[in-house]
């Protein structure tokens, strides 16, 4: 049995009125009696629907500027009453069963997002009656349907039509889960907002400013897919996304073809896409194990790809390729004919490219949409027993921010390459060293415990691929603690170094650059990446 329950009476009270008129009309056409409150009732009545105001049903008026509307036994008794068990009590008190509750909540998130929002504004947008009805209906899903999302309206009507105006228990249970998720997210937003208005635990000094981070951290993500396994085959995994991601990303991407994305695919694709977003010129980023192994600019995507691949063809095998322009057929053909690739992602993919990549059905081809800058937010990192939370690293220097600390000034070409490889270094695991020349990476040294060894690896990789390091620019994601890194760079033929500065031995490092006739640029900004 599907334990279907017929829908005879529905209570509608929504802040977001998207689709509510059409939904209410569909319910009315199917003989459902409509109860409603406030603005929702007025809207439905204006559209010619017969609606009973909740205040008329309860015999108790709305009061306190609408703060008290539905908090009444005739409402909650009708929702919570167990059919076949509480019928006598309901009849004694004149409580009619309510079979469906359609509620969404005051727009708290939109209210507090307004920079001019006051505490009083926030308080008045904390919904009380709405969450109470939602939770009541979800608790009694055995008998009552709760609808909190407008995108479920059509689904509900279709099922009613297929089941003689009834909804199955499976559907009511699914709607109840969505309802509890809805109220959990809502309460989490409120707790986060109020939690930022006071100092964090342990910092209760008088006069402390508001905290950027709430006392408790509440976040909600929606499962997009289950995975075969996680980072390793013995780990279970799933991919969760924000409810409404605002920025084009791997989370918003549409998969055009290919096998299901793996855990590592998603992590690597994110690294590649976020790096390529840094560039305004046609760019290609190739990533392996979350590190760029080749990055280049070009007059078009084909040139950018060819140059990025040239940096490290060995590591590019089985890599992730990201572009910041529409993927064209010529570039797609060059990739497919040249190398094995796991994922290709671009803001848009041409039909010609789709047709070409289709020859390799296992290649995952993603279209993420155009991006308009970066959205603010937090980066999260799990540690045993805790969670590290920080701002996203959206910092990036412009030419005017740079400080030349060497005797020799960088040439225009060196300056351009310095800014290019500084952007790349931001996305390389620390300790990060990037060699670049002519808008392409020459060698990349990543993830070494010693900065000097990262530099050596960058040089070895360049030599292995027959690339000339002499005349290149070197970027370091953090300062040089000793001059040995500069001496090694000079020996390799590096002519310009860009780094944050800030070491106690900065002068020693600058002196080394001057001795070798190198230009040295300080950014004043570090880009550790762990």
UniProtKB/Swiss-Prot annotation:
Keywords: Hydrolase, Multifunctional enzyme, Purine biosynthesis, Transferase
PROSITE patterns registered for this protein in UniProt: MGS
Documented EC number(s): 2.1.2.3, 3.5.4.10
Pathway: Purine metabolism; IMP biosynthesis via de novo pathway; 5-formamido-1-(5-phospho-D-ribosyl)imidazole-4-carboxamide from 5-amino-1-(5-phospho-D-ribosyl)imidazole-4-carboxamide (10-formyl THF route): step 1/1; Purine metabolism; IMP biosynthesis via de novo pathway; IMP from 5-formamido-1-(5-phospho-D-ribosyl)imidazole-4-carboxamide: step 1/1
Pfam families (UniProt xref): AICARFT_IMPCHas (PF01808), MGS (PF02142)
HAMAP family documented for this protein: PurH
Protein's name according to its UniProt entry: Bifunctional purine biosynthesis protein PurH
Originating organism: Vibrio cholerae serotype O1 (strain ATCC 39315 / El Tor Inaba N16961)
Name of encoding gene: purH
